[in-house]
Amino acid sequence: MMKKTKKGRVSWASDSMLCQVKLFLSDDCPVKVASNLPPGFEATDYATKRIISHIPRIKWKRPPLFVLDDALLVGSGGKSIETRSENLRISKVLEAFYPHRSVIPSRPSLTLAVEEEHYDDGKTPNIPLTHVEDERDAAAESSHSFEAPAAVSGLGPELSLLASAALSALTKEQGSQVDPDLLVKLLSDPKIVENLINGMKGKPLETANNSLNTDITEPRLAPQHVTSTTMDRNPPPMPGNVAPHNVPVSVQSSATDPPLPKPNQPMSSALSMNLTLQKPTPVVHNYPLSSGIKVEDSYTAAPLKPSTGDDVVVSEQKTQLLFPCSSWNMNKVPESARTETDPQIRNGNTNRDDQVSAKPVKDLDYFKNLIREHGAVKPATTETNNYKGRVDHKKIVKVRIQKPCMYFNRPKGCRMGESCLYLHDSSKRLWTDVAPPHFPRAKRLKFGS
């Protein structure tokens, strides 16, 4: 027999048994839990309830939208409205085409509103383009300059240029005792200038120079008497139809000779300097134009005989250059026929020691450049005088070993690349264990498919 089972039923409590129960969690704060505590919790006292009720309320303020920091760099005009309107205006402007020049307005860049306005352009200040320093220099030069318009009125164009150049050269020299006013007065009178020119033509060059001496004192060099008279006593044989060329050469230095004028001074001022001109016996050398001249080490002095002839050689210091004049009767050698030693003879540099000292000295950089160009030498050691141990890597020579690189032209290649110390020669095949390249084979035909 089967037992009878009772079904569980839920019945509603009676009115006397009904009560309200509030459920809460232990983590909830006392504010969420109401004052009506459930049964069994009436004895608990919350001390923090009074403290919470007395906390003052803070009024909420809305923070600003942007807080700019002084350290930040903000681009100006990034959100400008005018930029958009300007671009829109430019895009709406149409390009104008004028069929003829007469149709083009006078000033199309100006608007009508600007053309209608009346403005005096004379009120606009002129901005100078020159610097302030240039204006001061120009004012200083104009205050110290001498105005002499009458100085060149009665003279020719060449004489006026020479006179102005001589005046400017004499006034610029420091410690010059030449009176510029007196010089201007003399040059302004054409009669005095003509008399001076005629007097210079009638007298020898020596007396003319002695009459125009200036009181300019300069330090003199020590006397060095060097006169080249013997040059190539046994000249080389001349070819068939080559005529000999005669060149009188004479270089003399004495303590009584004054220094030559500066190169930037004209010839008129050079004539006013104290130049003592003498006529040594010219030595004529016969040599063909196509052959060189051999200078001997021994020099013998030739006697000097002053005369008033046309052939005059200026005696000057050995270390200075000779300035040729049109009155000197010296045979000129054409440019195509000048030899290597011709400039040395004309300049008076006949000493072989001077030629040796003029050669550049080969320093350490010269040999390093040779090593860098030709290679195959060990790199130079680091110099100890480098500042704070720094080494110039450009001067270090990379040595390449004369042995082929075993990784070059392999499938993976050489990792070092151009900086590899071994040779990278693509013409040679450095390995034999590489399989021949695979060529595509023809497809097999399938039968019976």
Curated annotation (Swiss-Prot):
InterPro entries associated with the record: Znf_CCCH
Stretches the record annotates as Disordered: 335-357
GO molecular function: DNA binding; zinc ion binding
Zinc fingers typed C3H1-type, residue spans: 400-427
Protein origin, superkingdom: Eukaryota
Keyword Transcription: no
Keywords for this protein: DNA-binding, Metal-binding, Zinc, Zinc-finger
Transmembrane segment boundaries: none
Record keyword Zinc-finger present: yes
PANTHER family associated with the record: ZINC FINGER CCCH DOMAIN-CONTAINING PROTEIN 45-RELATED, ZINC FINGER CCCH DOMAIN-CONTAINING PROTEIN 6-RELATED
Name of the protein described by the UniProt record: Zinc finger CCCH domain-containing protein 68
Taxonomy of the source species: Eukaryota, Viridiplantae, Streptophyta, Embryophyta, Tracheophyta
